[in-house]
């Protein structure tokens, strides 16, 4: 049921319409060769943490340049914490392949979602993925808006969220970029695909 709602919420309810939309706009405003930091100027993310950790750090945010500068990063975005495909397939694909990603020289694997850092923290702990993956909240969606990866999932009772996507970024430059046709899809954004692209 949730998958059907997500698919319906994606662009007039038609997967074909969603595919045509992606094709006509080149997937997103960024792609291979783009500088991810320049594409989202002034944007910072909030690292997943408990409320007490937030207080202790004055609710600090992390600028994108600090996340990507001088590093090889695999980053993936998803519609939301505690949702079906995200919990059952997307995050586990990266958690289960972390050693293979590190063996390819990846410095960090990052999950970003339009959520607050506290919900992400609880979710990451529930998935036992915090040791393998860094989780960041894009609480107001500004990062995903800047990349043209925002989607309205109000029909699935989620509001404005992120499309499901992944990228390999080397020192801020996008080397590989994958976006699913619908947020409920899980065909091109998993770790198995990005491993072949590094």
Swiss-Prot record:
Location of the Thioredoxin domain: 34-198
GO function terms (MF aspect): thioredoxin peroxidase activity
Compartments reported by the entry: Mitochondrion matrix
Gene3D superfamilies for the chain: Glutaredoxin
Active-site residues per Swiss-Prot or TrEMBL entry: 86 (cysteine sulfenic acid (-soh) intermediate)
Subunit structure and binding partners: Monomer.
Transit peptide feature range: 1-27
Gene Ontology CC annotation, any one: mitochondrial matrix
Family: Belongs to the peroxiredoxin family. Prx5 subfamily.
Name used for this protein in its record: Peroxiredoxin-2F, mitochondrial
Task performed by this protein: Thiol-specific peroxidase that catalyzes the reduction of hydrogen peroxide and organic hydroperoxides to water and alcohols, respectively. Plays a role in cell protection against oxidative stress by detoxifying peroxides. Reduces preferentially hydrogen peroxide rather than alkyl peroxides. May be involved in mitochondrial redox homeostasis.
Record-linked InterPro entries: PRX5-like, Redoxin, Thioredoxin-like_sf, Thioredoxin_domain
Reactions listed under catalytic activity: [glutaredoxin]-dithiol + a hydroperoxide = [glutaredoxin]-disulfide + an alcohol + H2O
Top-level taxonomic group: Eukaryota
Assigned EC number: 1.11.1.25
Species, as recorded: Oryza sativa subsp. japonica (Rice)
Alphabetical keyword list: Antioxidant, Mitochondrion, Oxidoreductase, Peroxidase, Redox-active center, Transit peptide
GO BP annotations, alphabetical order: cell redox homeostasis; cellular response to oxidative stress; hydrogen peroxide catabolic process
Transmembrane intervals: none
Top-level enzyme category: oxidoreductase
Keyword match Phosphoprotein: no
Further facts: The active site is a conserved redox-active cysteine residue, the peroxidatic cysteine (C(P)), which makes the nucleophilic attack on the peroxide substrate. The peroxide oxidizes the C(P)-SH to cysteine sulfenic acid (C(P)-SOH), which then reacts with another cysteine residue, the resolving cysteine (C(R)), to form a disulfide bridge. The disulfide is subsequently reduced by an appropriate electron donor to complete the catalytic cycle. In this 1-Cys peroxiredoxin, no C(R) is present and C(P) instead forms a disulfide with a cysteine from another protein or with a small thiol molecule.
Xref: PANTHER family: PEROXIREDOXIN (PTHR10430), PEROXIREDOXIN-2F, MITOCHONDRIAL (PTHR10430:SF34)
């Amino acid at each position: 049921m949730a998958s059907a709602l997500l698919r319906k919420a994606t662009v007039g309810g038609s997967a074909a319409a969603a595919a045509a939309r992606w094709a006509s706009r080149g997937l997103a405003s960024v792609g291979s060769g783009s500088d991810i930091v320049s594409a989202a100027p002034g944007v910072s993310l909030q690292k997943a943490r408990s409320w007490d950790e937030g207080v202790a750090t004055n609710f600090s945010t992390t600028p994108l340049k600090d996340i990507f500068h001088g590093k090889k990063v695999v980053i993936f975005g998803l519609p939301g914490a505690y949702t079906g495909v995200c919990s059952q397939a997307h995050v586990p694909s990266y958690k289960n392949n972390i050693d293979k990603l590190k063996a390819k020289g990846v410095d960090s694997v990052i999950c970003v979602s339009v959520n607050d850092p506290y919900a992400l923290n609880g979710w990451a702990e529930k998935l036992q993925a915090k040791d393998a993956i860094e989780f960041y909240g894009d609480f107001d969606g500004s990062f995903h808006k800047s990349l043209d990866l925002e989607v309205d999932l109000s029909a699935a009772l989620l509001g404005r969220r992120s499309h499901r996507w992944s990228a390999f970024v080397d020192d801020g430059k996008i080397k590989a970029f994958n976006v699913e046709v619908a947020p409920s899809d899980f065909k091109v954004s998993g770790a198995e695909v990005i491993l072949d692209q590094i």
